[in-house]
């Protein structure tokens, strides 16, 4: 399991499920849009503080961003 990829995939999934653009989401988090884009694409590491900011903006518990989906695991 690549935790950075899992986090980025989950961030994108939760953000899109809420119909929020990267730009609008970055504003909600107080982060830059290019940072959100880089995290979603596994190009940037993320601090614990920013994980919490993102979780708060999404309205989810932080740990939910770190859980690999069953169907992703099956693909290997």
Where are these regions (language model features)?
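Short basic helix-loop element that most often maps to the first helix and adjoining turn
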Residues: 9-28
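DNA major-groove recognition helix of helix-turn-helix/homeodomain DNA-binding modules
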Residues: 50-64
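Short, charged recognition helix plus adjacent turn
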Residues: 66-76
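Conserved hydrophobic/aromatic packing and binding residues within compact polymer-binding modules
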Residues: 11, 25-26, 36-39, 65
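Helix-turn-helix DNA-binding elements, focusing on the entry/boundary residues of the two helices
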Residues: 11, 22, 33, 48-51
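Recognition helix of helix-turn-helix/homeodomain-like DNA-binding domains
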Residues: 31-44
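Short, conserved catalytic or interaction motifs in soluble domains
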Residues: 41, 60, 70
């Amino acid at each position: 399991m690549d935790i950075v990829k899992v986090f980025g995939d989950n961030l994108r999934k939760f953000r899109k499920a809420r119909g929020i653009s990267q730009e609008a989401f970055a504003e909600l988090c107080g982060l830059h849009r290019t940072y959100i884009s880089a995290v979603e694409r596994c190009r940037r590491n993320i601090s614990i503080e920013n994980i919490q900011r993102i979780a708060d903006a999404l309205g989810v518990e932080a740990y939910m961003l770190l859980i690999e989906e069953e169907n992703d695991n099956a693909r290997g």
